[in-house]
Amino acid sequence: MKFGIVARRDKEEALKLAYRVYDFLKVHGYEVVVDKETYEHFPHFKEGDVIPLDEFDVDFIVAIGGDGTILRIEHMTKKDIPILSINMGTLGFLTEVEPSDTFFALNRLIEGEYYIDERIKVRTYIDGENRVPDALNEVAILTGIPGKIIHMKYYVDGGLADEVRADGLVVSTPTGSTGYAMSAGGPFIDPRLDVILIAPLLPLPKTSVPMVIPGSSRIDIRMLTDREIILAIDGQYYEHLPPNVEITVVKSPRKTKFIRFTREIYPKYTIRIKERH
């Protein structure tokens, strides 16, 4: 059994806990590698165990941080590696374990007392080319000039779904429905569902509303504006695009895999949504 460790880089408590996890696994005889960026912020790991995140080839990743740490893992790893997520963030919609339960959770993982929670992702094509990371939460198309709306049409499976004048458009997975899409007026979607949410950002007029479509759908977005736009993936990756670009979003063949110890969705999600607001 081989483990990878990734920690939130700006929080000393997360880095120290990462080292304790590393030491625990090494003492118990497991092979462990550590993310290079984690090591650079806390250089106490054995240097021979340090590799770049995009080279991880392990059975499990222990992620110590918040949702941002998980998104970094998902954007950089090349394989769908199950993630045990330890919450060192704020709300931690994606995380599973509180820091005080870290070693109890590791023992359960080692004993095989867990299940894999698979989450869909979406893939983006820019003029037919896939050059950006898959999104676990959302793809956002945003105005490149604050205060200036963008004009676009979007099609679902070839049919015109809406023509929108807005600050942008969010295409979200169920996992991302508690994030940017919810701020745009979208609903909470149970993460077990195979659907995609499309939500305009501050549309004019307000007759353009969020819609939920089958996960198998293809969304084609065509710009009718003459100004630059910004493409944002999970709030982590950004690219400026010319006004005549065509963007296509589909469900990715890849999935995010989380280590879970309970199949309970409620009340965890509803409580955290209320905490957020």
Curated annotation (Swiss-Prot):
Q: Which GO terms describe its biological process?
A: NAD metabolic process; NADP biosynthetic process
Q: Which family does it belong to?
A: Belongs to the NAD kinase family.
What is this protein's name? NAD kinase
Main subcellular location of this protein, as a coarse class: cytoplasm
Function description? Involved in the regulation of the intracellular balance of NAD and NADP, and is a key enzyme in the biosynthesis of NADP. Catalyzes specifically the phosphorylation on 2'-hydroxyl of the adenosine moiety of NAD to yield NADP. It can use ATP and other nucleoside triphosphates (GTP,UTP) as well as inorganic polyphosphate (poly(P)) as a source of phosphorus. NAD is the preferred substrate for the kinase, but NADH can also be used as phosphoryl acceptor.
Temperature note:
Extremely high thermostability. Upon heating at 95 degrees Celsius for 10 minutes the kinase activity is not lost, but about 80% of the activity is lost upon incubation at 100 degrees Celsius for 10 minutes.
Q: How does it assemble?
A: Homotetramer.
> Which cysteines are disulphide-bonded?
none
Q: How does activity depend on pH?
A: Optimum pH is 6.8. At 70 degrees Celsius for 60 minutes, the enzyme does not lose activity in a pH range of 4.0 to 10.5.
EC identifiers of the protein: 2.7.1.23
What's the name of its gene?
nadK
Catalytic activity, reaction form: NAD(+) + ATP = ADP + NADP(+) + H(+)
Per the record, its GO cellular-component terms are:
cytoplasm
Recorded hits in Pfam families, A to Z, give:
NAD_kinase, NAD_kinase_C
Q: Does the keyword NADP apply?
A: yes
